[in-house]
Amino acid sequence: DSFFGFKLPRGMHKEFADVIQKIAEKQGEVAPDQIMEEFRIEYLDRKEPYHFRKCKITDFESGDQFTTVAVVTYSDHGETKQFEGVGNGPIDAVKRGLEEELGISIKVLDYSEHALTSGSGAQAASYIHLMDQKTGKVTYGVGISSNITRASLRGIFSAVNRLFGDAQ
């Protein structure tokens, strides 16, 4: 069940199929290259209003407990900003930081990842299933990078933009 190397989570199939269905209703048959382009537009290239730039991750150990601090640089409608989040790992730290920075309440429902290519420079794909806890709306975000942490954080920003991009 691979699509141009992407192994979409089961729940994401319907979400993306709905996007393609709307296009098919307007123009008829949709070619595979156009499907990939729509995937890129919907998930990979969605950088508005929030565009992930970089993140510095620091782990702190206290006994057998770990705390992760993430300092994230991002763009908000083109303006460079920064926030800090603290959590039990990079995804949790960035999620908490985004909630505080943007005044949102989100829940990670699911997370998965896989290699898109092989070798030492392999690209990874990360899928994040998020829910807006205020409205109950859910969506997926996708990130790719040769760094799995960066792919995951891009996935969070992709999902946040899909949830809140049109409303703000």
Predicted regions and their residues:
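Terminal or standalone catalytic/regulatory effector modules within metabolic enzymes
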Residues: D1-Q168
